[in-house]
């Protein structure tokens, strides 16, 4: 997908905004590598914009999506991989050691982090900051704590970005959905800045994953900063079901019930209704079913009208039951 984007938008000067819906295959767990599961993913991307406003637009969109789905109790957890990367650069940790450290911090394995750091010859101040990472989660106090751990410029800029983003979210009443986790890292090396996940009750995995990947498209010849997210629809539906959330939606449409010998008339009526913007569902009338059963069927299908076409009605005349 990113290779196609890089080629198609290579010459674009202004930002590009995309959305997508499709099925993907993913490894469901690190314990079952190679065991793929199909998930439906809905997502959005903002390409060629590395601004704070772009970060805000994407995060606020995530919150709006969760609210629109009917969720009220959820958290969007924000981090910034640049903080971790800055500590790695200052300590000179690379290769397998860097990968192992990332994994341990991501898993909140405090003692594993401590053991690994003890085996490395690095500055005590940097080691202390890295050891704190698995515990750097919570409210805005986390950001103050993070800034007190290091004077590394890359790390300070990473925290400043989170603070500025939070202020924008707070000014627009999104702050109650926000928490922070500077130890929430990703095994995907292409993330370069803001990283986020959205969690709610009823699912053990994040419903939303996303972040900033400013150098990913550059690997395909299109050096454009990007940020985006994906909603795992399967997890979202599971959470809604387990929280007993039923989303009301605007019912619009007609159930067209016709006798077998009036199929042609029913088709003509459906064409006329559809031409006016009405959704139409056609079904053949069976003597074994009562009118009330068809009306109930329409209600279950979120159709507001039932039209019976039989010998009593001409092809351009229908009877509606609300």
Language model segments and positions:
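Short, conserved phosphate-binding/catalytic loop or strand-edge motifs used
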Residues: 37-42, 78-86
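Single conserved hydrophobic/aromatic residue that forms the stacking wall/gate
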Residues: 1-2, 322
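Positively charged, Gly/Ser-enriched RNA/tRNA-binding surfaces
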Residues: 4-12, 16-71, 117-319
């Amino acid at each position: 997908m990113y290779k196609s984007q890089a080629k198609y938008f290579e010459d674009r000067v202004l930002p590009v905004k995309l959305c997508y819906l499709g099925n993907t295959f993913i490894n469901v767990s690190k314990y079952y590598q190679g065991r793929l599961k199909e998930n439906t993913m809905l997502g959005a991307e903002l390409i060629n914009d590395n601004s704070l406003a772009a970060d805000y637009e994407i995060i606020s969109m995530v919150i709006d999506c969760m609210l629109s789905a009917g969720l009220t109790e959820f958290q969007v957890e924000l981090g910034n991989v640049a903080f971790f990367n800055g500590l790695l650069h200052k300590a000179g940790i690379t290769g397998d050691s860097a990968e192992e450290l990332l994994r341990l911090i991501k898993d909140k394995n405090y003692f594993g982090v401590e053991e690994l750091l003890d085996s490395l010859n690095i500055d005590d101040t940097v080691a202390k900051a890295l050891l704190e990472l698995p515990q750097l989660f919570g409210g805005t106090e986390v950001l103050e704590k993070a800034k007190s751990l290091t004077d590394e410029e890359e790390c300070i800029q990473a925290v400043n970005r989170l603070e500025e983003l939070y202020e924008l979210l707070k000014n627009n009443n999104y702050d109650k959905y926000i928490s922070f986790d500077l130890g929430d890292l990703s095994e995907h090396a292409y993330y370069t800045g803001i990283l986020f996940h959205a969690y709610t009750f009823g699912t053990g995995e994040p419903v939303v994953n996303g972040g900033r990947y400013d150098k990913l498209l550059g690997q395909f010849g299109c050096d454009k900063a990007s940020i985006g997210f994906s909603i795992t629809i399967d997890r979202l539906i599971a959470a809604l079901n387990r929280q007993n959330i039923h989303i009301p939606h605007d019912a619009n449409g007609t159930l067209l019930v016709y006798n077998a010998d009036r199929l042609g008339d029913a088709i003509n009526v459906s064409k006329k209704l559809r031409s006016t913007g009405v959704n139409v569902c056609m079904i053949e009338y069976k003597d074994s079913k009562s009118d009330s059963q068809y009306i109930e069927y329409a209600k279950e299908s979120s159709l507001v009208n039932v039209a019976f076409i039989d010998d009593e009605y001409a092809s351009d005349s229908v009877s509606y039951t609300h």
